[in-house]
Amino acid sequence: MWRRLIYHPEVNYALRQTLVLCLPVAIGLLLGHLQQGLLFSLVPACCNIAGLDTPHKRFFKRLIIGGCLFAGCSLVVQLLLAQAIPLPLILSGLALLLGVTAEISSLHARLLPASLIASIFTLSLAGNMPIWEPLLIYAFGTLWYGVFNWFWFWLWREQPLRESLSLLYRELANYCEAKYSLLTQHTDPSTALPPLLIRQQKVVDLITQCYQQMHMLAANQRNDHKRLLRAFQMGLDLQEHISVSLHQPEEVQKLVERSHAEAVIRWNAQTVAARLRVLADDMLYHRFPQRFQMDKQIGALEKIARQHPDNPVGHFCAWHFSRIARVLHTQRPLYARDLMADKERRLPLFPALKNYLSLKSPALRNAARISVMLSIASLMGNALHLPKPYWILMTVLFVTQNGYGATRVRIIHRAAGTLAGLIIAGLTLHFHVPESYTLSGMLLITLLSYLIIRKHYGWAMVGFTVTAVYTLQLLTLNGEQFIIARLIDTLIGCLIAFGGMVWLWPQWQSGLLKKNAHDALEADQQAIRLILSPDPKAPALAYQRMRVNQAHNALYNSLNQAMQEPGFNTHYLEDMKLWVTHSQFIVEHINAMTTLAREHTMLTPDLAQRYLESCEIALQRCQQRLDSDGPGSTGDVNIMESPESEVPIGPLSTLEQHLQRILGHLNTMHTISSVAWRQRPHHGIWLRKISR
């Protein structure tokens, strides 16, 4: 029972965050320096935003960099304010100076908002204490945060990675159940496919997250991570065999009518899903897995395959489920390979600075957007006669996310949570509760807020707002008079952040659709080249298959985010959803062909070359259609006909059937894009016609 409690992801996270915040307050209370303890507890907020609690092979190096940036920004703000430099200029300069971190890596990019938050915290401290005291608070606060988190992760044995792997296995179980229930149900594809695509998107997102964590921990170089690395590679093999599709609904219908295949397939899928959920719990709660076999289920599938040798569905299900069963039985991947190389870009400082100084740099646009928003917030504070508008500035930074949709949702949750929290705090302040009870209540509220923050950010904001008001009350003894002002400041900050995301150099996801579609087609092309090569190696096939899945997932994510953006053309949306659906079918065929190529199911060299030429022509045709700014025509000459005409007529092998279907999907995608491209949204000048 205690394992399920202490290792539960939400409970473990809430305990860690609550202890790292509240232990300094408790020590300050015991030593008679409660105010210093409360100020010390502000530093973990900066560290959380900077991601300094991320398990990393350079954990303490990142900690030192973060602490130096926090203390340095605090010193700069205090010195410049002492010289009467306007606050908008100070914050704008810091934002533009620190924006280069986004060019180094995505993890370094989180140092920008965290350092700005540290600067804004300094506004409330400047003039109330010596100039060196905030520097010590940030330095020792960051050190405390790092040492505590290092000890916590050592104590719980890399719990974040276990949580990600557990989520991956659980999502694979849900995906397996949903996929094979659709195989035996007569469901309209237009309604059945979107939920399945969402599940597959979650699986690939979790795989990408696990890759990032593995590389950050250098898991392939550490003996204590080999078991988790093996579990991750097992998950990759399971995803490969679960995600393949036959795409022969008429054959499925024939087999279901002639046998009890529907019940047997569902039995196998449910058995696999149940075992995956058990393994997910075993990883999360640090248990050794028990022995597992599903010989009866596989035997029933093989019997159906023998009874209906002319129907490919039985052989398809028996073969893939037998591979899944082997992975689950042996608790090992199907074949040995190293971890796929990390594709995360990391630049040294000076090359990153060179890229940052380009007007095309997304990092520069993001830093400029933040600097303008902070300047407007500072000027708004001056207009409202607020010498230190730190609440407006913090609200702007807290609600600003990477995209329009995420920022809009965060603004709604932040505003609603802050409003409710201020009302509750305003009512409870009238009761004049003793300090000991107040601190105990703040501890409980903080724990409950961290328990729900991952899934219910708005409700968590209610608790955090209450604790913030009571912190002001304990520090200044006049928290009640801040309530109305803080509500107005929150609304102003949310409006500034929303306006900045819409009007200040926005990066619309609809503008990235073309790039992501290009990347997906390019990944498909490389995978087909590798599969049809004379001697494809198993590790290379596995790496390229995952790149195909990740490229399609990026396209699917950008389409989902673009659907929430303003000014989106509904006709274009429907057409692009259909385009992405056909792209997903190609991914499933590549998944299936990868397993065939690894088992040395090959074509003759001449036939492989003809199919490769056909596929490359079709892929290039789709890419050229995306590059063209003209309306296009759906009646273009099919340039795939010539290579296809040389393919012998007769029974096709399984690999040839997959290739033929890929060609059909590419032809349909070209037709769709010819129609859809005229209706694409124009958010700024993001597509330019190249005149020759």
Regions found by a protein language model. Give the residues of each.
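Generic detector of multi-pass transmembrane helix bundles and their immediately adjacent loops
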Residues: 430-571, 577-580
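Transmembrane helix-loop junctions at the membrane interface of multipass transporters and ion channels
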Residues: 110-134, 469-486
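Structural signature of hydrophobic alpha-helical transmembrane segments
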Residues: 27-42, 76-93, 134-140, 380, ...
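Hydrophobic faces of alpha-helical transmembrane segments in multi-pass integral membrane proteins
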Residues: 15-23, 27, 64, 68, ...
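Long, hydrophobic alpha-helical segments that serve as membrane-spanning/inserting helices
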Residues: 1-15, 22, 26, 30, ...
